[in-house]
Structure formats: C-alpha cells, structure tokens
C-alpha cells in the first residue's frame, strides 16, 4: 500500500468508513480534479484512491495538471499501485480537448498565497474567472452528475462583528484594494455557478472553505499556520505582522475532503455551503499563544510587530465566524480540534 504515514492511514481509514457519504454514487464513475497537486486536491485524490481500493468502486480519477513530471513524482506510489489515476496536461484557462467522459468535477485550481494576490492580481482573477467558466462549460457539455467549486470564506469580506455567518450573509469587500482580487474573483465564480445551475441545469455547488491545514502541508508553506508550526518546532518566537485580532474558523484537511464530497453527493444545485469546524473559531493571536503553549512548552513568546508595509498583504481585521448548519444537516461533521490539526501537521513536518 502506498500510504507511508500512520497519521495519514488513520485519516484514510476514518474517511473510508464515513456512513453519511453515498459511496455507491461513485461506482464506475470518472472524476475530474483540478488543483490536484495542492494541499486539498492532493488529499482528496489520495482519499478517493484509497476508498476506491477498499470498496472496489471501480471509479477512475483524472487530474488536470500543469506539470506532469511534478504530478507523477508526487503520486508515484499511487501510480505504481493502480491504473485508475491518470493525468492530463493543461491549465484551467485553456482546457485541452482530450479530457474525455466525465461524471463529476471538483474544481480546486486556484492561487492561495497572499504574496501572489498582491504581485499577480490580473493572473489571480484570470485563473479564477476564465478557469471556472471553462469548467462550467465542460460540466454542461459532459452533462455531469455533479460539480463542486472550491470557494473560500474570504467571500464574506471583513465583517466587523462576531455574529455567525450563514450562506445568506454578505460582507463588505473594497474592490479598490489590490489584494481583494482574490475574494472578488471567488464571489464572481460563485455567481457563475448559480447562473449555470439556473440557465443550463448544471448540478453545481460551491464549498466555502475555512483555512485548511493538516498532514500534507509543505514545510516551506508561507501561510500563517505553517509559520506558527515552524516556530514551535525550531524554538523561535512567533512574530505577528498584524495585531492578530482577526478571528476565523479553521478546517482539518480530511474534514475538508469529507465536506467537499458531502456537497458533491448530497448538496442542492446552485447552493453554497460553509465548510469549517465552528469550535476552532479564535483570533490569530490566540492561536499563536496556543501553539506556543502546546508545542513549545511555553519556551517561546508571541510578539506583535505591527509591520504596516507587510499588513498590505493581509485583509483588514475581520471576524469570520462561520455557521455550518446547512452542511451538518446533510450529515457531515468535523473530526479534529485546532490543536489536533496542529499536532498532526507538525508530526508530518518533522
């Protein structure tokens, strides 16, 4: 078996035994994944390949990738074990013609780094808008059984109070701020999904994911959760470039995967669903303190630098307290606390 980590094996076993997922809907189906080499996409791919083997579903996965050599290297153990995973070289902005029959689409291709949003806002928008339009056209052409667009909790903008945010709530986003190219593009992509669902009866849903991490995070990842983990592992003080007052929910990688598949198999076309662990809601400063306490035995401190230039990379102070009731009503539930997420991520990084 190609699983070389006890933690990942535990996650896959739990995932494959989730009784609220309608596995039979995937039998003999062909699933297209974009963004398959990213954190969520790669976890999703591994999870589906594991379930396919354990339940003999005879499903096949095709991943759209920019760099086939990179993808084959990343998933070499799976490729040695099965013929039911294949790669198509291309990009979402210009889909290749050789995709073939598709039953389900999970569209996760997207930049995720704040630095990239600031330096390449045009490319951020083009990847989102053109890519999603192309995938929706493909879904219409192939008459797929279902499609999920991976959106973000950032579409809620910068709420100034801590009230729960349901899928019906909207927040303020200033389109004149360069970094907001990302949430504005995500909003437009969700609107396109609704348009295709209504005009062409494409069975498409959006998953509004909280910030997601766990096993599989690259040790050089620049996002704040990975930086906190590295500081704890190296015994370095955690330095915050903002005051750390923003509060949000988080999500474990495998919980993200189970949420996405719940939406794909049980969601209502045209709807969006929050995907988060409500119990993880905390400020960035509070999270830093908990990491220092739990993984560095309080031997490191949390310092607030308040770097005004660096702050331009980040959204203004906000409170993203997601209400996950709609997804829970479909049977989904998260499995890992915030510190469990950190523990499993750090174990993989070591």
Model regions and ranges:
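C-terminal substrate-binding subdomain of Rossmann-fold SDR/epimerase-dehydratase oxidoreductases
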Residues: 1-4, 86, 232, 236-350
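Amphipathic terminal alpha-helices
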Residues: 1-23, 46, 56-59, 337-350
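N-terminal Rossmann NAD(P)H-binding glycine-rich loop of SDR-like oxidoreductase domains
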Residues: 30-50
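NAD(P)H-binding glycine-rich loop region in Rossmannoid oxidoreductase-like domains
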Residues: 83, 88-127
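Active-site segment of SDR-like NAD(P)-dependent oxidoreductases
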Residues: 111-115, 153-160, 210-213
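Conserved Rossmann-fold NAD(P)-dependent oxidoreductase catalytic core, especially the SDR/UDP-sugar
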Residues: 133-180
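NAD(P)-dependent short-chain dehydrogenase/reductase
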Residues: 159-168, 191-248, 253-264, 289-294
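Active-site helix of classical SDR
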Residues: 181, 185
């Amino acid at each position: 078996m190609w699983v070389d980590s006890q933690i990942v094996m535990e996650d896959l076993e739990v995932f494959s035994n989730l009784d609220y997922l309608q596995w039979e809907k995937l039998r003999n189906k062909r699933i297209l994944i974009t963004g398959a080499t990213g954190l969520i996409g790669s976890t999703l791919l591994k999870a589906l390949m594991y379930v396919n083997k354990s339940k003999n579903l005879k499903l096949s996965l095709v991943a759209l990738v920019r760099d086939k050599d990179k993808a084959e290297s990343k998933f070499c153990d799976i490729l040695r074990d099965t013929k039911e995973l294949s790669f198509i070289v291309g990009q979402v902005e210009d889909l290749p013609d050789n995709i073939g029959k598709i039953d389900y689409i999970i569209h996760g291709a997207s930049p995720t780094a704040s630095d990239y949003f600031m330096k390449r806002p045009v490319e951020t928008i083009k990847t989102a808008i053109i890519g999603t339009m192309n995938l929706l056209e493909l879904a219409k052409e192939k008459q797929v059984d279902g499609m999920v667009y991976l959106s973000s909790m950032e579409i809620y903008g910068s709420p100034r109070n801590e009230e729960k945010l349901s899928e019906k709530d909207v927040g303020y986003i200033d389109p004149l701020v360069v970094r907001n190219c990302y949430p504005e593009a995500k909003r437009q992509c969700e609107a396109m999904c609704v348009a295709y669902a209504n005009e062409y009866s494409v069975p498409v849903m959006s998953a509004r994911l909280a910030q997601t991490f766990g096993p599989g995070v690259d040790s050089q990842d620049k996002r704040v959760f990975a930086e906190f983990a590295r500081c704890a592992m190296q015994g370095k003080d955690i330095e915050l470039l903002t005051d750390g007052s923003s509060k949000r929910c988080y999500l474990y990688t495998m919980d993200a995967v189970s949420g996405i598949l719940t939406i794909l198999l049980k969601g209502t076309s045209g709807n969006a669903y929050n995907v988060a662990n409500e119990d993880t809601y905390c400020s960035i400063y509070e999270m830093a303190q908990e990491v220092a306490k739990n993984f560095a035995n309080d031997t490191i401190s949390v310092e607030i630098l308040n770097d005004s230039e660096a702050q331009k990379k980040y959204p203004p102070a906000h409170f993203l307290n997601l209400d996950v009731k709609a997804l829970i009503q479909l049977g989904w539930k998260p499995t890992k606390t915030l510190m469990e997420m950190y523990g499993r991520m750090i174990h993989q990084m070591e």
